[in-house]
């Protein structure tokens, strides 16, 4: 059919045989066939063992055998395109966290993400041709309506089989959706996406569905094709198999999933009857024998294939494959085409670029256009299962236990991964990685992003730091940071920080007794215990600024030397340990923000570390009443080395897990943590594990201790290049490798991961701008490179 624009250009509508919807999920074609399409999420493959992938391939072959019918055809499409759904609006408490999120999305993610969409199409043909001539004679008799009803029943039966078999792949049958009172055809939108590589809404119209799809002008030539839209134009080229690979394997075309440009991979498979299939194999064998072909092994395999076909180990079909690559201009198209062609050739096929058949190859991408297929070939259902894996990179989850995803990362395939902090309702996370690889930066980034989950829920984040690495992030987000140092006022004053409640009375009695008995000289007498209870009651009745350990001591016996008062004296202000808990003010605020504690200098000072931990965790525990709460600990192995601190933490964590709390831990080598009974228990409870690359990873620790698979261990030790800023996220629901490269956000990295020199530099800026609590931050981000070692 000639187009209106000239004698050499055809109207695109003649290639679009779609009449319209018979129902929400079924479309009628001009030749009387009916069609149904599903979008498939795909299953993760990157870190999966080959045995599982082989099993899926066998299961797909079994499905094809079960639905084999010469009146049925299957199309499989992979569309890699740039229409990535936007993240949900994000709301933060602090200006810095909002700025960090915006910078990350604009500098790291913007323009760097593509999406892989798989589509599966089933086409059921009428038992007899229902073309235009046939319809004239059957219109009045009603036979066509009966035949069509039978086709629809057949389609639904087939669809139930397919949907059941592919349930694990995330199959979503396309139909009609409504938005703001307007009906849109999802099937039409999928067809248009296959045609153009770009998503555009397609409304339901009263006329031809095909006409409603063709809204952009397509011009085909021998070198390529051009698609002209009202906004712009872009070009494409199509590649096909000239010769098939000698062998097929699961996911053999998966290299296309990670290319950094749009493409459309089309495959069709029309079942052959068994006599037709045997004839194909016999003809090929006879041709090789009559020509004196010396490929004896191949001839023998053809004979084996005939036996397998007779045994129903597979079925055969007419297969067609094409790859359409898109670019903005011809120069870019040449480079992209060469790269795509190389990826396909790596699968073992001989790949050619379409020339004179470009127009037919382009339109053959659309389901139902069998007459335009170029270079079809007969293959087995096993081969087809290898070509069509429906494998993909994980997408994460748009929402979880605490609401919408808090961050988006980029996978190895350049696709978006939406990160939620929970696996089901468990928010226990462990991060492992060698020093300097970025684990602290990632942990602090996650803590900043968690503001979204806290802002409307009065939630709290508590962070136990090591060497002040997270101090700048805590201060930048308006939080409180206490660096506890031996011999200087700690900011911990339990008598002044606790309210006058029964819980405070009980805690202080046990806590003061522990202080007294920490000298190893035994317990206190019943009389001293009664005096202590009265003293605590009296102290808590005062205003906070009037309370002190020294004042409490007045209620106890000062002599003899083994008396409780005498033993408590060293903890009073002005004495050896008075700096620890008897200061002028208690600085533990725990308001709806982030509070950081650096106990690095106390970890080896067991006498102070244990009661400090007990007080902090008591204060934290009071916040855990069902409200959202996050406890995070950097280099937590150092905390585990203190047995008293470990004991307090172990008891405390049970409360966290039961009351909507989260735990995020980070450390360098897992083997050091696994040696600790508490560490091993903690890691086992962490449903989310994040690994940075480690060339020295210990096999026993990662596989036996952390339950990594062989593929995951290989990725950690070999595949993830050190310094690439990639991490492996492991969960029961699946594993994925993501990028976290902030090389274009140096000023934010300086805040997320503090070093000794940058912490000192920031402290000087804060001192210079005393009274302006937030002014130091912008100056620091502008001048962080001036920090001297």
Swiss-Prot record:
Q: Where does ATP bind?
A: 433-440
SUPFAM superfamilies assigned: P-loop containing nucleoside triphosphate hydrolases
Pfam families, per database record? CagE_TrbE_VirB
Q: What keywords were assigned to this record? A: ATP-binding, Crown gall tumor, Nucleotide-binding, Plasmid, Signal
- Record's signal peptide: 1-38
InterPro entries, per database record: CagE_TrbE_VirB (IPR004346), CagE_TrbE_VirB_cntrl_dom (IPR018145), P-loop_NTPase (IPR027417), T4SS_component (IPR051162)
What superkingdom does the record give?
Bacteria
Q: Name one GO molecular function term.
A: ATP binding
Q: Which family does it belong to?
A: Belongs to the TrbE/VirB4 family.
Q: What does this protein do?
A: A possible function of virB4 might be to provide the energy, via hydrolysis of ATP, for translocation of virulence proteins of the transfer of a T-DNA-protein complex across the agrobacterium membrane.
Q: What is this protein called?
A: Protein virB4
Q: Which organism is it from?
A: Rhizobium radiobacter
